[in-house]
Amino acid sequence: MNLRLCVQALLLLWLSLTAVCGVPLMLPPDGTGLEEGSMRYLVKPRTSRTGPGAWQGGRRKFRRQRPRLSHKGPMPF
């Protein structure tokens, strides 16, 4: 009778611990869930638009310049 009561108490303790933690305590974490350590690999930081990029200097070379409107005269329409 006493052994059965101890086994039931241990089982109840084990079930309550696994319900709180979500997984059994002896299993190592496999790393497939979203944890704080792996969140930084999922989200890329935003870069500034005006900062130097990998191809931004070459893009400036080939961009067509806007005409200056200060010396052009009246608009045609």
UniProtKB/Swiss-Prot annotation:
Domain of life of the organism encoding this protein: Eukaryota
Localization, UniProt: Secreted; Secreted, Extracellular space
GO CC, one annotated term: extracellular region
Official protein name in the record: Apelin
Gene source species: Mus musculus
Tissue specificity annotation: Expressed in extraembryonic visceral endoderm and in the primitive streak at 6.5 and 7.5 dpc. Expressed in the anterior visceral yolk sac at 8.25 dpc. Expressed weakly in the embryonic heart at 11.5 dpc. Expressed in the adult heart. Expressed in endothelial cells and cardiomyocytes and weakly expressed in fibroblasts.
Cited function: Peptide hormone that functions as endogenous ligand for the G-protein-coupled apelin receptor (APLNR/APJ). Functions as a balanced agonist activating both G(i) protein pathway and beta-arrestin pathway of APLNR. Downstream G proteins activation, apelin can inhibit cAMP production and activate key intracellular effectors such as ERKs. On the other hand, APLNR activation induces beta-arrestin recruitment to the membrane leading to desensitization and internalization of the receptor. Apelin also blunts mechanical stretch-induced hypertrophic induction from APLNR.
GO terms, biological process: angiogenesis; apelin receptor signaling pathway; coronary vasculature development; drinking behavior; G protein-coupled receptor signaling pathway; gastrulation; negative regulation of blood pressure; negative regulation of fibroblast growth factor receptor signaling pathway
Propeptide: 23-41
Induction remarks: Not up-regulated following myocardial infarction (MI) (at protein level).
Record key words, sorted: Angiogenesis, Cleavage on pair of basic residues, Developmental protein, Gastrulation, Hormone, Secreted, Signal
Any one GO MF annotation of this record: identical protein binding
